Amino acid sequence: MFSTFGSVPILTVVAIQLFLIRNVLSLNLTNAYLHHKCNNTQGIYKRGSAFEKNLNIALRTVIFNGDFRTGFRYGDVGEDPNTVFVMYQCRGDSYWSNCRTCVTTALSGLRKRCPGNKGAIIWYDQCLFEISTVDSYHKIDYENDFYLSNPKNVSNRELFNRETSALLEKLTTKATDKKNIDGANQLVLYAAGEKRIGTKKVYAMVQCTKDLVFTTCSSCLEWIFRMYSDCCDGKQGGRVLGTSCNFRYELYPFLRN
């Protein structure tokens, strides 16, 4: 069972944008834009439509009434065929004010890149944000993924691949531990760690969206690990990002302590 957004006054587009502009000024410069997808199959909404009104209610709730302590929110507004589903997930080290800043930036970026789309996803370094007409709660999204990698290669490819994969598998076990819960009694579904490989130290993380359970999180991570060879074979750094889960590793620290 998931929480739905309550009935609140509709936020005008102008008010949203003014709020976004103020918050973008405090953006952490490491929070880079990564990728987006405008889902044209879900259609385009019209100005003043019931869908737009529901969307504005959802966005108002996310930005002004959102609880960013756990870094995750999923909810819906309206009745079919104008139901709006909204979801954000912040990186495991980017909760509270860092999460709010990233979500605010992501919302602004989504409006600019996918204006009028009923379905769209945007990824930033510290969060992802999605609007949709489809209820995806507890479900793995197998359709939306991409990868990024460092163009530089390591010297011992086979050893590096083997040890990095082992680290990611270890982190998956930790992230999907049923005892790994946060202050809100939610599964954390996130883990980070490091490992020395020869003279190098590898830093890594894995994460799933908090609507998943430990079994589906494990399945999602196993799925994106299959893309390791395409993304990251012998590379000094790489990541695969989906809507439901992601992993990343680098030869330098990239997370907050």
From Swiss-Prot:
Keywords, sorted A to Z: Repeat, Secreted, Signal
Secretion signal, residue range per the UniProt entry:
1-26
Does the record bear Transmembrane in its keywords? no
CDD domains assigned to the protein according to its UniProt record, in alphabetical order: Gnk2-like (cd23509)
Q: Mind naming one GO cellular-component term on file for this protein? A: extracellular region
Q: Major location, coarse class?
A: secreted
Q: Which family does it belong to?
A: Belongs to the cysteine-rich repeat secretory protein family.
Name under which the protein is recorded: Putative cysteine-rich repeat secretory protein 28
Gene name in the database record: CRRSP28
